[in-house]
Amino acid sequence: MPDSTSSASRGGVRIARGASPWLLPTVATAALSLARARKSGRWAAVAVPTTALAAGMLWFFRDPEREITDGRVISPADGVVQSIMPWKDGRTRVAIFMSPLNVHVNRAPLAGTVTSVEHIPGGFVPAFNKESENNERVVWHFDTELGDIEMVQIAGAVARRIVPYLPEGTKVEQGERIGLIRFGSRVDIYLPEGIDVAVEVGQATTAGVTRIDRD
């Protein structure tokens, strides 16, 4: 089993693009309540939960630097492998569940060109539920050395907004940041026929680090 942490994040940690609508109001409220808490007990009572919430938001939207692993296909998401399923067209789908505690920035599994980015409206049931197949999603297609690679970002019960970073036609490097799913959710990657899967159900993955395929 590959080690998903051997090339873990190095260097600084920044805030993910697309976090502002949630993060800025929360941090501003926490800062205001802390400033007024010195003069008012009522504001002191407000400062505790708002500061805790702001700290949680900063953690949720962290975007650490990564040393990208060498390999044909690397994980697009931090999380846990939820399922590995043979698909009707010969491909293999690897589904990675992202909890609210994981990094929510997704990365390109291979180098190539973005040939399609399609937003599909849908529901918001928990991403580990079978009904999540009908959730809101963004479907990516990449033209790579292995041919067409499909990756799907799926919104969950908490994560109700997917933020793609790149438009169609963009050339990407392996491990490059391509989008954000706010809070918890799921990412599926479809491996072409003939590509062996290196991960196992229940294995932790790190975006840009864990190798998905086997030589």
Swiss-Prot record:
Is synthesized initially as an inactive proenzyme. Formation of the active enzyme involves a self-maturation process in which the active site pyruvoyl group is generated from an internal serine residue via an autocatalytic post-translational modification. Two non-identical subunits are generated from the proenzyme in this reaction, and the pyruvate is formed at the N-terminus of the alpha chain, which is derived from the carboxyl end of the proenzyme. Its main location: membrane. It catalyses: a 1,2-diacyl-sn-glycero-3-phospho-L-serine + H(+) = a 1,2-diacyl-sn-glycero-3-phosphoethanolamine + CO2. This is Phosphatidylserine decarboxylase proenzyme. The gene is psd. GO terms for cellular component: plasma membrane. The keyword Membrane applies. Belongs to the phosphatidylserine decarboxylase family. PSD-A subfamily. Keywords: Cell membrane, Decarboxylase, Lipid biosynthesis, Lipid metabolism, Lyase, Membrane, Phospholipid biosynthesis, Phospholipid metabolism, Pyruvate, Zymogen.
